[in-house]
Amino acid sequence: VAVGYAGNTAQAEATVAAIRDAGSNAIAVRADVARPEDVARMFDAALAAFGRVDVVVNSAGVMPMANISAENLEVFDRTIATNLRGAFLVLSHAASRLGAGGRIIALSTSVIARSFPGYGPYIASKAGVEGLVRVLANELRGRDITVNAVAPGPVATELFLEGKSPAQIEQMAKLPPLERLATPDDIAAVVSFLAGPDAGWVNAQVLRANGGFA
């Protein structure tokens, strides 16, 4: 496993250690997915370490809250750079480097279906990701590579919790009929399914793993 990370070296190294403790091999590669040279270097490192790439999961993302206002253009640009430009770069390298049986998985969001105020830049970026997934699945026709997206609802991660009050978090947790936030393991299980043999006939789809949130 090649673990790409933006800046949290300690967390990346801990993830690598956990993978190795479980009996597999792993490396960590620091990369900004908005930078073409970083994405190329990340794939090069994976190929150098393991000889091939079978599954690519693009989960890099930012989620700043900003209304649709001219004064928030910098926030919009930054969100698009990481979430959409980054997805374009990662998916393009995956398309050129994976062989038959490969799996490409991108992360979207179920917030697209709810259109909450303040989520404009984030929703715009993730709607673009879903478009890329469907187009790439068709561009890879005949190569036996699937391209799908997972669209979680609210997940109890640092990205989601940052900047929200306890009352806001509780309110969001009550939105799904299951009345809780998802855990990272909930979403990882869906990604694992798409990466595995049982999902060989699932292609160009967006799986909305959200507990009924949307």
Describe each model-derived feature in a short phrase:
Residues 1-13:
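Conserved glycine-rich Rossmann-like NAD(P)H-binding loop of the short-chain dehydrogenase/reductase
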Residues 67-68, 72-80, 160, 172:
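Substrate-binding pocket helix/loop in short-chain dehydrogenase/reductase
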Residues 71, 111, 115-123, 135:
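Active-site loop-to-helix junction immediately N-terminal to the catalytic Tyr of the SDR YXXXK motif
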Residues 91, 125, 133:
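Active-site helix of classical SDR
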Residues 96-97, 138-142, 200:
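Alpha-helical segment proximal to the catalytic Tyr-Lys
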